[in-house]
Amino acid sequence: MSGTNVEISVVVPVCNEADNVEPLAREIHAALGNRAYEMIFIDDGSTDDTAANLRRLKNELPALRILSHSFRSGQSAAVASGVRAARGPWVATLDGDGQNDPADIPKLIVARDENRGVQLFMGNRKASRKDTAFRKLQSSIANGVRSGLLGDGTPDTGCGIKLFSREVFLELPRFDHMHRFLPALFMRQGARVISIPVSHRPRTRGSSKYGMLNRLWVGIIDIGGVMWLRRRYKSGLLVRED
């Protein structure tokens, strides 16, 4: 069910995921088809048939919207484009590689309904992650360092499946790779964050867009930047007009 009164906007950034977008769009519809929802796929400069495969689904899936970047801008920019275009007050995100299960989105919605006043619900894959042992170790170390330095209390910020307030997201500072630091950035705004266990699936089509070295060095630089942002931010300013 879709329409102008959208409850949930599902934002999916994709780049060269031609083989994944069709099954993923169908899974999103299966998970949310009885709700007022929309799904927004952002094609971030793909050079394969990602956009063409999505366009073929438009008549079958009226809730599907397709945005396209004219050149590759990165996952955070794609997510931000989708959130700005979203019509719903709540936004769910998924990675475009098919490893996040759209069937977990209703679980996050239930958590939202049971935890009024929480603005970000983070997926946590730790118990179900389907990656190599090295990838799991790499992620565990990165999450430990990040959590220790930022104090965000979130065990798995790299998980692509999230549900959050669109209003709060639009207040956040924009920078490349910001999607990896949403808990710290939401908390910077005074928002509450909780983690919810979700499933995780192996990648069966396509290839990862990230390597070990770019994750490592970019992560180190970005953690320093987020620490600076948190120190410099002053909240709670009340402006009164007499």
Task: State where each predicted segment sits.
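Hydrophobic helical membrane-anchoring modules
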Residues: 1-7, 114, 144, 149-152, ...
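Structured catalytic core of nucleotide-sugar glycosyltransferases
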Residues: 1-130, 167, 171, 184-196, ...
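Generic alpha-helical secondary structure signal
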Residues: 23, 49, 136-144, 215, ...
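Short-chain dehydrogenase/reductase
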Residues: 72, 132-135, 139, 176, ...
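Short, conserved alpha-helical segments within structured domains
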Residues: 75, 157-164, 178, 182
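Residues that recognize and position ribonucleotide moieties
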Residues: 84, 135, 162, 179-180, ...
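Short, flexible, basic/aromatic active-site loop/helix in glycosyltransferases
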Residues: 115-157, 162-170, 223-225
